[in-house]
From Swiss-Prot:
CDD domains named among the record's database cross-references: QueC-like
Gene: queC
Catalytic activity of the protein: 7-carboxy-7-deazaguanine + NH4(+) + ATP = 7-cyano-7-deazaguanine + ADP + phosphate + H2O + H(+)
NCBIfam families found in the cross-reference section: 7-cyano-7-deazaguanine synthase QueC (TIGR00364)
HAMAP family linked to this entry: QueC
Listed name of the protein: 7-cyano-7-deazaguanine synthase
InterPro entries recorded: QueC, Rossmann-like_a/b/a_fold
Family in the record: Belongs to the QueC family.
Amino acid sequence: MKAICVLSGGLDSAVTSLVAKSENYDITTVTFNYGQMALNQEIKSAEKISEILNADHHVIDINFVKEFSKSGLNTGNIPEPEKEDLDDFEKSEKTMKAVWVPARNMIMFSIASGFAEGIDAEKIFSGLNREEGVTFPDNTPEFIERFNKSLEYGTLNKVKMVAPLYELNKPEIAKLGKELELKLDLEVIKYSYSCYRDNGEDYLHCGTCESCMRRKRAFKEAGIVDPTKYLVE
C-alpha cells in the first residue's frame, strides 16, 4: 500500500507520518515551498524525518503563492501572543488571520492528490487536527469531507485524504507521537520543527510565536519531556 504524507516537518505532520508508518504504508513525503520564512528549517526537519522513516522525500515549489500572500509566514511579521491568549477565540482568530496563506491547504492537497494518483497511492495523510480546526477553516472535518468529495470527481483512482489527528488536540498529539515512537522504536519528534521563523540553527525554535507556544504547552500538558530547544523558554 502506498501513501503520500504532506510533511511540513512540524509536530502534527511528523506524528501523522508515524501513524502512516505504523499502518505499514509505503510512504512518500512531500514538503511545500510557498516562500515561508522557515522553509530551510522545515526542509531539514522533513528530510531527517523521511530518512528515519525510510521514505522518499520531495520538495514541491509553489513559491508563486508568495506573490499574492500577505501572511506573516511570508513577510516575517509574526504575531507573538501571550500564553493565556491561546484559548481566547477572538485573539486566536486574529493571530490566524495574520498568518493565513491564501488557499494554502487547498493548493497543497490538490497537488499532493495529483502526486498520489501518479504513483498509484491510495491515501494522502495530513496533519489536520482539532486544535487548529477551531480557528483555521481548512483544518476542519468539513474541509476534509468536502475535499474528498472533490477527489471523487478529480481523480481516476479515487485517492482519499485522511487526517488521523483530526479529533486530537496538541497534548494528545504529543502523547500519541511518543507512543508510536516507542512502538516503532524510532526517534522522530525531536527532529520536528514547528516554529514560524528560521532562527539560524537547526531545530532551534524562537519560543514566542503561536506555533512555538502551542508546542510548549502540548508537551507540558501531556506530561512528556519537551526535546525542543527554544531561544525563549
